[in-house]
Amino acid sequence: MSKLFPNATQRTKAPYRFDIVGSFLRPEALKLARSQCQCGDISCADLTAVEDQEISKLVAHQKQVGLHAVTDGEFRRTFWHMDFLAALEGVQEVDAKQFSVQFKHHNVRPKTLKIVGKIGFGEHPFLEHYRSLQKIAGDYPVKFTIPSPSMLHLICLVRETDYQPIDLYKDNEQQLLADLAQAYRDAIAKFYALGCRNLQLDDTSWGELCSEEKRAAYTAHGIDVNQLAKTYVNLINESIKDKPADMTITMHICRGNFRSTWFSSGGYEPVAETLFGHCKIDGFFLEYDSDRAGDFKPLRFIKDQQVVLGLVTSKSGELEDKNAIIERIKEAAQYVDINQLCLSPQCGFASTEEGNVLTEEQQWKKLEFIREISEEVWGK
């Protein structure tokens, strides 16, 4: 029982009181193997063997630190989103003059996505990624992360100022959205059939729609940002509408996470009523590690979802003040019941293979710190 909140209890279902976003720093052995594979010095099979080995170590460490569900750390990916989206049917990764958003003080590899055919899920390579993770984890619960469907629309149609639709989608954006939602329904069904019961959608579109700067820029290009928010909520709802009752689907909202930098700022208020009030997701992983995320007042629109507070930054290795974190949980509990709140890092530790600016030791100490706080707040 919690001494801080007499009514607070632990959870036995995702999202958990002590949880994670999903990605972890890539070990040096994995970075070396990927580089060697790209140079042709080792085969793809050799790289997969190294990935398997490093994911096995990672899973063991996650169990040791007390996580209730383990991830593969996104060790088989270069980006948190591009690898998945580019492997959809009808989507192609292409070179670009620059990445589709600009991070503070850092440049990302200039790649973007292009829709070249009918969007579908097909026999996506991430199905094998999930199978491998489940095999490594054994009977232990696993969590799997994929980008939200809105990310494909955002990258190809919104950030891209010179979008040229293929004939299939010319003057028919609704068909594109319908095909995209169907692709995700197929994905959810296939992951579920493999045993997945804890799926997370990662989404930076909401971070952009919280930003006054981004909203002004999109408005200047003729985009109705309020309607875009409604479109994305509808797209997500259509994508998850056939979700089985015993499957949890959450969404992580991010403002950018590349080498400890970011690309947008702003509180949740501009999208709160639309997103929190109408999106039928089971839980939200929300960044709240800095002033860039604003206050907790937007949480007043939360209905019966769980809210995982990302109060502990993954962008640096320095530990926060425990009492300050607990006070912020108390603040959030003014808007959402304490038993609808959980705690996690603000984001993953390596949304891209480069990773954030902290050590692996600091990464694990962050998680031990979060577990300790969660036990004080919600009990053991």
Range-by-range predicted roles:
Residues 2-380:
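Domain-level signal for soluble alpha/beta catalytic cores
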